[in-house]
Amino acid sequence: MLFYITVTVLLVSAQAKFYTDCGSKLATVQSVGVSGWPENARECVLKRNSNVTISIDFSPTTDVSAITTEVHGVIMSLPVPFPCRSPDACKDNGLTCPIKAGVVANYKTTLPVLKSYPKVSVDVKWELKKDEEDLVCILIPARIH
């Protein structure tokens, strides 16, 4: 019996992701990557005065012709906007719009971690939106260092 419990715990741990889905309504998130951090990390350490690259593989459940990006740092339940270099996700982010339903798309962009950011723990909320509705919504636990 102890063997089965141990195997179950190991399988669940092996499948653990460093991000959580916070309401992806119009797409299925396939994978998320953050430069320099493995998927089994508990949090991402973001160094101030540097850049971090994020990639999100997803498949929309509906045809999509335009996607906007919103990024927030959530500190004590308060969302603080992060600067987004390209809010139009269909430009310079690896996406070719329109995207057909069921087709896996790869979004990739770079986020500046400004020197002015305080050294705090934060949940990075990354949203890709279609007509103000969440196509993709993920939360990434991070620590700004």
UniProtKB/Swiss-Prot annotation:
SMART domains: ML (SM00737). InterPro entries: Ig_E-set, ML_dom, ML_Npc2-like, NPC2-like. GO terms for cellular component: extracellular region. One of its GO terms (molecular function) is sterol binding. Keywords: Disulfide bond, Glycoprotein, Secreted, Signal. CDD domains: Npc2_like. One of its GO terms (biological process) is intracellular cholesterol transport. Belongs to the NPC2 family. This is Ecdysteroid-regulated 16 kDa protein. It comes from Manduca sexta.
